[in-house]
Each structure stands twice: as structure tokens, then as C-alpha cells.
């Protein structure tokens, strides 16, 4: 459904998450200089969507949905639960220019923890190799699931309205999609 308007921040989040509507840099520049953008169709002559600082709050809590199917989920299971382990892990990955997206940490048993994250599929093998070198001798297990898809739901106020997550999870359930990781931000 076409929106009459959307905020810079919502459009920037959609662009960053893979919506192929506007380049995220163009939205950043428009926001920086307070320039309204109008996204138009090249196929039909109709009013487009205005990207601006403050959007008229329509009744829709969900402003957009994106998908990224070029994703790998990597998990390190059973790593020692000591200060600095996450720093070491993500520093090694950053040194190899591997961009990390969603991060999930859970406390394991017997003084261990598990960390899972997503990255581009093209970096999965290198990331696994780095992590096996780093944690393999400590008894941790590194796993990689690819391909996986990341679905992002964008909207202002989603956390303050009960039932929004339930509806989204219900739609995934109806489509037969199993959820591997969940992350929220607002």
C-alpha cells in the first residue's frame, strides 16, 4: 500500500534494510539539509510518497517491510562467559571488513554463552574460519546457516501498541516460516 508520506528516519531505515526505493545516502543528505523528497512511479502519473521530517501519522503502525535473502546466520555456541569475548570476536571480524547486523546473545550453561549474528552470505565462510580459529580450541562450536532471510518491519510506535508483533508472527506462521532470531529496536 502506498504511503502519502514517511519520515526521513523511517525511509532511512527502510533503505538501509534493503528496500530498493531510495539509496540511503540520498535520504541522509535530504535529512541533513531538510529537503523533502517525493518518490514517484515511472509507470503511472500519480502523486508519490513525500519523505519529510514529520509525517502525518496515518493509522498504519507498520510503515514498511523489507526482506534480505543474501544473509547468513553464524552462531558460536559454548564460548566462555568472560569479559572481552564479544569484543575479541567482533574486533577480528571488523578487521576483515565483515559487517555484522543482528546480534543475539544468550547465557548458556556452566559458565558459557552463545552468540549468534547475521552477515552477508558472501562473508560467511571467512567469518566461520576466523571464529573457528578464535574459539575452536576452547571447545566452542561455530555453526553457519545459509541462506536465511531477514525480514524487517519498520514503523513508529510499534513497541507501544500491543498486538503488532503478534500479527507479524502470525503472518509468518500462516506462510509456514519458522523464526530463527528476533530483534527489536525503536
PLM features per residue range, with description:
Residues 1-185:
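C-terminal catalytic "cap/lid" subdomain
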